[in-house]
Amino acid sequence: MAKKILVVDDSALMRRVICDIIDSDERFQVADRVTNGLEAFELLSKNQYDAVVLDVNMPIMNGLQLLEELRKNKITAKVLMASTDTKEGAKITLDALELGALDFIHKPDSAMDCRVDSFKERFLSTLYVVANSKPAMFSIASRVQENSRTAESMVDLVKKNPRKVTGSKIVAIASSTGGPKALQAVIPRLPASLDAPVLLVQHMPPGFTSSFAERLNDLSQLKVKEAREGEELQNGTVYVSMGGMHMNVKNTAGKYTIHYSDEPAREGVKPCANYMYESLIDSHFDEVVCVVMTGMGADGTAGIRNLEARKKVYVIAQDQESCVVYGMPKNVINAGLSDRVVPLDQLAQEIALSVGVKA
């Protein structure tokens, strides 16, 4: 049965083009189309849709205001945000993801550009993921905020529950759909004294990862930044891969630095976590702590398998219940690569216990 889609856009031309694209795919059916957030709210209050395609800038009630109203009234909806490719657009998109949107796509400025095959393919594949995802994680997020230990108490926890942490370690995290919100329940809980650098590949297009890293940095005690070419890795710092490039780690005279490559997308994504994991094969870290979080597809599995063949790894996968999309962790688990499977609210603790903190 075709998935029922609600389209919310104030532009009659753009609305028609988006609806035509959706209806061209037998997996979907445009059930309703409206011009602003208020009309959408009225429909969502009484109808169920498999996904909502939501514009940002609209009269009467814009996209963010609709998400706020849905959250306030505890109305669940699986929202795909149509964003603009600007610095301000990136900020608004991150706000939307915090408010419960599951994913976003850059909407071209003109309706003509929307008809290009590359956009249509990307839009329909993203819509399929959203339509088959769980609704926004309001309850999970609130539970994490209420029950999570602070970064300071995490240090005490690690010291009171020491594991045999020896040698140098590095943490490498992969996440996709649902990741931006889930990562806000993980990274801010890691202590600044974490005794390892952290690499992070979140599937995002160019122009969004810088704002995403800044937002995580504002919430965290340890430093979070978009990784720059040639930058040397430091313990207690999270390096977020740039969008649209593959992040690798190079060993130069005993120093580990960030290196980007512009190879084609792999697993349908760019950046791809497989490149990150495989770049650590020839490193001298005594152990690589691999963390695979919510997301569609199998990114991370091949890279971790290749890494495990050459190095000691410890693989942590997010559990099914707390994932928005149980794809990437499921593939790692089914491949027999996972050492621990834990819910979202235990990931930070598991990472900290695995690598330790500086004395």
Protein language model regions, located:
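Conserved acid/base catalytic micro-environments in cytosolic active-site loops
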Residues: 2-6, 12-27, 33, 38-39, ...
